[in-house]
Structures are given as C-alpha cells and as structure tokens.
Amino acid sequence: MDIGPKDKISNLPEALICHILSFLPIEDSALTSVLSKRWRYLFAFRPNLVFDDSVCLRPPCGHGVIPDYVTSWILNVLERGVLDLDLQVNVNGVRLPSKVFVSKSLVRLRIESGNVRGIDVDDVFLPKLKSLYLHTIMLGKGEDCFEKLTSGCHVLEELVLNNVYSNVWNRSVSSKTLKRLTLWCTESYDKNPHSVLFDTPNLVYLKYSDYVAAKYPKVNFSSLVDATIGLAMTSDQDANASYDALVGNATDFLMGICNVQILCLSANSLAVLTFCCESIPVFNNLIQLTIKTNQSVGWESLPALLKNCPILETLVFEGLLHMYTIKCGDVDGCLCKYSGEVPSCLSSSPVKVLKILRFGEYGIVNQIEMIKIFLETMPHLEQLTVYYNTPIGGDLIEEVSSQLKNFAREASPNCEIQVIPDVLS
C-alpha cells in the first residue's frame, strides 16, 4: 500500500488553482512556477495581478522603469480584457496613453499619481465602466475633456476626480447614470473656473470642493440626498470681500442643491454664502446640517442659513470657532451674544439633536458661553452631545459636563446632555 505523500493540489482543475493563487501576494504565487512544467505559467492566469516595482526589482533599479515599458504593459492588459485596473504611477517621463480610456471590458478604473500626469483625452469608450477614480491628473488640451469622460461611460455610477484639471478652466459633468460624484480641486491653483456645469439627475451623493466659478450654466441635482460642499473664494476675492457688493456669485449652484437631506459645509463655504450669494435658498428637505468652523471665517451667513432649514433635526458643529466681525453686534448677523438679543434663527429652531465636535480647541470659555445660548434659546432641543478634545479620563470632562447641566434650560428643560472624549466621534 502506498502511504507516501500525495500532491492533491496539482490534480485540481487549473481554474481552481488560479483562484487559489489569487489570494497570495504576486511574488509568492510566482514562486510556484518552479514546481513543475504545468505550474510554470499558472500564476499568470490568476484573475488579479499586482505589479509593484519596489518588490519586483531586486535590487531596486536606481533609475526606475523605462516609461515606454509602462505604456506597453497597460495596453497589454487592456487588450486581454481586464475588468479592474488600478494604476499608481510615479515614474518620471510617463505620459499615460489615451487608450487607457478605451476598453470594452473595464468595470473599474483607478489612476493615481504622486504628481500631475498628462493624459490626452481623445476618444473615450468604456461601455461597461461603473467606477472611475482619477487623482492628480492633467487632462489634455481640449475644451470638452470632462464632458468626454462621462459621455463615453454609458453605465457609470461612481466618478471621483481629485485634483483633476485641464488646460481650459471649464468643468462639465453630465450623466444620467451617475449616482456618486466627488469633484475635489486643490486650493493651490487659486483661480476661479470659467464655467462649471452639472447635469446629473440621478445623483444621490456629491462631494464638491472648488473655487467659486464665474458661472454655473446648469445645475441639475434633482435626486440629490447627501452633499459635502467646500466652496471657497480666491485670495483676490477674499481681499476685496465687502458687505456692500458681491465678489462672486454661487447662487445658481446653491439653488441647485437646495433639495438635499444631508449637507456638510466647510468654513470657507460660509464665507461664500456671505460674499458670493444673492440670497440663501430655502432647504425644505434638509434634516441634517454639519458646519465646519475655523477662526478666520465669520458666521455672518449662519443665521439666515438656519432660518431657511424649516425641518432641520440634527445640527452638527465641527468646532465652535469663528472670526469676530462687526456683524457680531447684529442680532441676525451672528449666533454669539454680543448683540444682547436672542437670534430668531435659534428661538424658532426645529433642531432636536445638537452635536459639538472638537470642543475645547483654543480654549473653552467662549465655547461654553455659546453652548449656554443654545440651551437657553432652542425650544425643541432633546439631545446635546459635546465631543471634548481632551485626553480620555480627564477631570475636565466631568467639570464641563457638570457646568453644562447646571445651566438654566428654559427653552428645552428636558434636553439630555452628554460630554464625551472627541476620539469617539
């Protein structure tokens, strides 16, 4: 009777062996090629291949890889019907081929680089692509680069463009299939785009950061539910900002997102509402609002914004910081108590849940006073949670909690108050 060891794995079907190899690091699965003639090329047929030059080049090549080789590798996998392509390119001299946007098989495409790489957007034909992620990429010289990207992706559902630019300062995203969109442009360029157009009627999630455009010819977000907005003024606009005249106009864009249910605004967006908006639209569907704050931006637009959220349930402040301005003395020009009167946006507020994140940054005296105003004036408040930016277990948490609970809560006597470490937020 044969009781010696048996190679049961080699008797498995090749498809199953390739599937098993797909769970190993590429360098380990490649080592199986020495087992026998049958195993020699099996690792190359695994459904996922990861090429990392820091692993494959031993000793590391001091001058990197030859740019032409990178192009041929990319074209090779595209011709072989790859479904998921993830390119992280940090090779000097590489200009990615425009054919990276031509594939009948691709379902997911991700291109990321350590610095701006150029891709000429000639023809885009990605009929099966559902997810497209581009990071730090310079698109070609045409005026319709952004439009070409979406028009050539017939079933695209998710589009992420982080620091993606073209030589023409226009941005246009038009797609009936798109559900999630991230358009995040760095502030290092300090320039207003000429035109930004959104025609995405089925979009439900938007993350958008940019300088205020000269115009928004079309903003179609009829299905939008959740939006994170980081609009900003350029340094020139900021220097010329005045209460007497607008230095830009983001009104059309803001009108386009007024049907959202969940909204997060950067501190700079508050400044845009103040100096680049004819009037703040009414957010009739908004139930959760998050406001990010810093010491260089005032709250002049906040009272009008809160007034125009008639069914708001949850209000979140990331910090209670703001720049003190002449409007702080106006009852409807800020939320602080320098006017000596209660802002009507608080006394009529429908908010039930109030959350304060990053509490304690840059001192707590003024922030405690601000929370006291909330407790005294917001009539429907049921829950206040303060996330204290202090080490866990510190006595300060108990002290602040006790102080807040001792405040007179005339407007919301049954409000539950919690103070917890910010690390839990």
Swiss-Prot record:
The record's Gene3D superfamilies line, in alphabetical order, gives: 1.20.1280.50, Ribonuclease Inhibitor
Source lineage: Eukaryota, Viridiplantae, Streptophyta, Embryophyta, Tracheophyta
Which segments carry the LRR repeats? Answer: 86-113, 138-163, 185-210, 264-293, 294-319
Q: Which Pfam families match?
A: F-box, LRR_At5g56370
Its signal peptide is none
Q: Which domain of life is it from?
A: Eukaryota
Give every F-box domain span: 6-54
The record's InterPro entries line, in alphabetical order, gives: F-box-like_dom_sf (IPR036047), F-box_AtFBL13-like (IPR053781), F-box_dom (IPR001810), FBD (IPR006566), FBL60-like (IPR055294), LRR_dom_sf (IPR032675), LRR_FXL15/At3g58940/PEG3-like (IPR055411)
* Protein's name in the database: F-box/LRR-repeat protein At3g59250
| Keywords, ordered alphabetically | Leucine-rich repeat, Repeat
Keyword hit for Membrane? no
